[in-house]
Amino acid sequence: MAKTITISEEAYRLLLSEKREGESFSDVIIRLVKSSRKNIMDYAGIWGDMNDEEVNKLFEDLKKMWERWNVNA
């Protein structure tokens, strides 16, 4: 079943630029949404190349964000 949606000119141009030959706009939207979803395992080991200073900075920044969001760390 088809649905009609309204999009801005900018959104249309962006979708059109992503559209491949023979692909419908529905296909483009589905492909883009699926490709933007990441599996948590894609990030496994990603911090392995960080040095101690970078890790400490990361955790300091996270703590500041948690405090700003009023979340207990």
UniProtKB/Swiss-Prot annotation:
Keywords: Toxin-antitoxin system. Pfam families: VAPB_antitox (PF02697). Signal peptide: none annotated. It comes from the Archaea. Coiled coil: none annotated. The keyword Magnesium does not apply. Disulfide bonds: none annotated. The keyword Metal-binding does not apply. InterPro entries: Put_antitoxin. Belongs to the UPF0330 family. NCBIfam families: PRK13696.1-1. Possibly the antitoxin component of a type II toxin-antitoxin (TA) system. Its cognate toxin is VapC21 (Potential). This is Putative antitoxin VapB21. The lineage of its organism: Archaea, Thermoproteota, Thermoprotei, Sulfolobales, Sulfolobaceae.
